[in-house]
Amino acid sequence: MVLEVPSITPGELHDLMRLHQDAEWPECKKMFPWAHDISFGQPPDFPHSLAIVKSQSDANNSALLRNSLEVNDIFQSWKVRTSFHREGDTCETGNDSNGFQYPNNTKELLNLLKFQIRQLELQVDDVALENAATYCHNHSILPFLKVDPRGLSLELKRYSRNKVGSNTTLKRSGQDVWGRRGLFRRFDLQCAKMIEMVDNIVIYCSRTGGSTDMQTESAPACSHEGNCPNCTTLALLLQICLMFVQKGYVGSGGSLYKTNLFICTYQNFNTDIPQTLIGTPLLDNEFFKNNTPLNLCSSPSEIVCFNNVDKNMVLCEKLELNKLTSATRLEETGLICGNTTDWHNYQIIKKNNISLTHRFEENTSIVNLKSLNYDTDNPTTSISQLYNIPNTKEVWKLIIKCTSNSQMPSLTKIRTYLDLLLDDDASKSQEHLHLTFPASGSIGLGNLNIQSVEILLNVCYLIFQVSQVQELLTFMYCEDGYTETSLLLTAYIIFHFNIPLQDALLRIHPRPFFLFPSDLQILGHLQPVLREFSPQNGSNLKLYANALKFRDKSFQLHISSELFSSIFFMKIPLESNFVNLKGPLPSRILRHLYLGSLDHAQNPALLKSLGITHIVSVGEVVSWTLNKDKIAHPVRPHRAITMTNTNEVAGNTTCNKSRNRADTVVSDKQENGSNVVISENSGFQICQIENLDDNGKDPLFHQIDKVLDFISNSEATGGKVLVHCMVGVSRSATVCIAECMRYLQCDLASAYLFVRVRRLNVIIQPNLFFVYELFKWWKKHYNREKDKTMDWHIICRGIAEVNMKYT
């Protein structure tokens, strides 16, 4: 077989893209359960569908078409001699009928390709096949689509470790697909699923003549011909892999291959290809050598990445979090909380004496930020829009960095800083006073002793005294701007205002914070001590003022052994709405919208203290809304469902890991018939979505307009809504994403990130079915700029990328 791949012009590609954009994506009932699993059966029909694949990546990620894929998105990765390779293990598949083993070099890759060719009864030129094996070697891929069960059997034999959302049991029947655990979040498969489903595949690259290097002229020439070896080899590989996966379909009854393959040719990438098709233009190397004097970005490539919506979800998550947690002053305290980027930018601006307008708005976001032009003469104009610029007119004197590997500062160091503060010359100098402090979640009640409590008290005292010196402020920060600073921040708010822990959390809540159960326990026991030394007590304030006025360098706070002992006998009031929670407070997504768990909804006093007036219960029943006859069965008595391994959302979380969410096992015997019931109870308006489970098949969006109308009516009357399910990561997160799409008039990817970032350390995980419903709903109601539409598989690729660090 000699594969002849026709060439198409950029204009013809544009026509194919228009047909694809106008095409109707398959209905949910046809897309699923096929999209959930590796491929045992035929894909749904999707007439006029198009996938674009780049055959050769560029080092600087330029020359990218919109909605285009790369080979690593489609093919299974090839890992050679990893730590999982046991000595003497031949890595055979365990299924002798497959007749192949895991390849460890190009020759074995070639043998694997030859095996596939024999199975398909094809005749392929030896040179072409050798080129395909070399291509696989160069790109570290196996000649299998990610959805091919036989390719996965190779990987599973040598790499048996489970990953979040992955399935390690291969079965030939699709009948049990709904019952398999962890299967309904395979976003990583959807690019390969798209390749398997589409009618047309267009291949391109930025290869110029005989070299894959870019031209260096300011307007790089990039002539791309139909005989490009990269593109023709990829076309052959795609044809073999598509036919091979189709051969494994259950009950296919013959050849199904129907995909049209094309290679796009052009003389100049930037001028020949319509601008609506270009995600990132071909850029010369000089562009990437320019550096901003602010150094806010590592290179101008971040501006390029931001402008390409197809490839920027990881970057946008970082930028959105930076905006959300940027430096803000807490009321009248003299304490500013922020993130590492704030401190970095503050130093750069001050050091270089750069005149840059302070930019900060509460609830600021990059969601509606348009494409940025990179001005080499004035780079800060565009780059500064990606960040909230700190106010460098403020004097940040005391700098406190909280990290997980920090020890408590010594009392001697704190006293030294107090001495410097009392020295006129030292206090007016530009030199900063630096402290480190242990991160939230790193101290347990059993770690406390008199010295550690005194250190915490004196750090709070130092922050207060810095604020009493004219124009001096304290900047407290950590990497993400909230996780590691929350313990010290909350302790200081209790100390400064002389308020109980519950009220302190309410004061902080407009700003992101996250307290671990151990933090709540410590603060609950320490709050009497912190309040006893609060400057809000008249005698304390006078004492602290005199220490500053008379330059008493020996003054420090001390506690008696009796007071220390009383800490451990202190009981947290049972009526405390916040401290007895098993996790964090509900996450504020918008001014009128909160996302939380069933635990939050079960606590009406907590909701009232947050100003919440409306509740949306997604598939769960709040016990206090039931009459006494029903309280014995508070959770969906009408559904055959078992919740296992709930592992409460804040229980076992570390700073860098996500929580495990509840696994759901659902009987197939009952069809979903969800409905919406609106009622009033105990002063709350309640919207109950009944009979909806997180099982990868229950539909939500036939009810979504009713739910969003309920939320909209609440917002119009000045109310606030809590949306919850069991844990607050899938069903309720889906509703919140839909509300953000409606309220912010943004696309699905932007709304997903907006909610994800504001859920803080609780990682949202809407199942694949819900996200596809969101996609279809957005296409129907809000897809006004089709040229900028992000395809389903591209959105899934982005979600898989931002979730990668948790797998």
Swiss-Prot record:
Q: Which UniProt keywords apply?
A: Cell cycle, Hydrolase, Protein phosphatase
Catalytic positions? C725 (phosphocysteine intermediate)
Instruction: Tell me the organism.
Output: Saccharomyces cerevisiae (strain ATCC 204508 / S288c) (Baker's yeast)
Q: What is this protein called?
A: Dual specificity protein phosphatase PPS1
Matching entries from Pfam families are given as: DSPc
Q: Could you say which EC number(s) this protein's record lists?
A: 3.1.3.16, 3.1.3.48
Reactions this protein catalyses = O-phospho-L-tyrosyl-[protein] + H2O = L-tyrosyl-[protein] + phosphate; O-phospho-L-seryl-[protein] + H2O = L-seryl-[protein] + phosphate; O-phospho-L-threonyl-[protein] + H2O = L-threonyl-[protein] + phosphate
Show the GO MF annotations: protein serine/threonine phosphatase activity; protein tyrosine phosphatase activity; protein tyrosine/serine/threonine phosphatase activity
Q: What does this protein do?
A: Protein phosphatase with specificity for serine, threonine, and tyrosine residues; has a role in the DNA synthesis phase of the cell cycle.
Looking up SMART domains in the UniProt record yields: DSPc (SM00195)
Family label: Belongs to the protein-tyrosine phosphatase family. Non-receptor class dual specificity subfamily.
Q: Name one GO cellular component term.
A: nucleus
Q: Where is this region: Catalytic?
A: 593-807
**Which InterPro entries has this protein been placed in?**
Dual-sp_phosphatase_cat-dom, Dual_spec_PTase, PPS1_DSP, Prot-tyrosine_phosphatase-like, Tyr_Pase_AS, Tyr_Pase_dom, TYR_PHOSPHATASE_DUAL_dom
Entry's PANTHER family?
DUAL SPECIFICITY PROTEIN PHOSPHATASE PPS1 (PTHR47550:SF1)
Q: Where is the Tyrosine-protein phosphatase domain?
A: 585-783
Entry's Gene Ontology BP terms:
nuclear DNA replication
Taxonomically, the superkingdom here is Eukaryota
Protein's UniProt keywords contain Translocase: no
